[in-house]
């Protein structure tokens, strides 16, 4: 199983070990979700100010958040699907706020590693079409998150 992950660290404070952890968590999720080899995702680490701008500009929420995902497979209005092109499957982009991840790790009483793994997985599942807008969707998505985190060894 090979998931291509492009990391961009705008904070310049994310250690290679954290990127490796996220790579391994997302590889495990891709395996458990039967994602084909060669699929691509980008992960960008930002500060609270930057994620607040993105949240405001794209989601009309003028506040920082922990993770935002932009799925590439969702068709926008007026976009045409490219059929038959032999291109890798581009799943989308994950944007993670490092300060928010640190705050939440402390708030929830677990490690920064676990919080980063959780946030990356949460955003990744959104890229695959999972959501939590309804109680039923939330139960499915959070159940799957728990399964994958436990299989990886990051359960609570």
UniProtKB/Swiss-Prot annotation:
Recorded protein name is Endoribonuclease YbeY
Binding annotation for Zn(2+): 122, 126, 132
PANTHER family from the UniProt entry: ENDORIBONUCLEASE YBEY, CHLOROPLASTIC
One GO MF annotation is: zinc ion binding
Q: What is its main location?
A: cytoplasm
Family under the similarity heading: Belongs to the endoribonuclease YbeY family.
- Output the SUPFAM superfamilies linked to this UniProt entry: Metalloproteases ('zincins'), catalytic domain
Do the record's keywords include 4Fe-4S? no
Instruction: Cite a single Pfam family from the UniProt record.
Output: YbeY
Gene name in the database record: ybeY
Superkingdom of the source species: Bacteria
Alphabetized, the UniProt keywords read: Cytoplasm, Endonuclease, Hydrolase, Metal-binding, Nuclease, Ribosome biogenesis, rRNA processing, Zinc
Query: What GO cellular component term, any one, is given?
Result: cytoplasm
Q: Where in the cell is it found?
A: Cytoplasm
Note accompanying the cofactor annotation? Binds 1 zinc ion.
């Amino acid at each position: 199983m090979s998931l291509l992950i492009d990391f961009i660290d705008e904070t310049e404070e994310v250690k290679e070990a954290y990127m490796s952890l996220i790579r391994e968590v997302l590889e495990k999720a891709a395996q458990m979700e039967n994602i084909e080899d060669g699929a691509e995702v980008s992960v960008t680490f930002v500060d609270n100010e930057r994620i607040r701008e993105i949240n405001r500009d794209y989601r009309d929420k003028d506040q920082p958040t922990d993770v935002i995902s932009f799925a590439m497979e969702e068709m926008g209005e007026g976009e045409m699907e490219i059929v038959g092109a032999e291109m890798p499957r581009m799943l989308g982009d994950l944007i993670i706020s490092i300060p928010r991840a640190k705050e939440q790790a402390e708030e929830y009483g677990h490690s920064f590693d676990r919080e980063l793994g959780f946030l990356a997985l949460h955003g990744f599942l959104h890229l695959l079409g999972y959501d939590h807008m309804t109680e039923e969707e939330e139960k499915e998505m959070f159940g799957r998150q728990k399964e994958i985190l436990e299989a990886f060894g990051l359960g609570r």
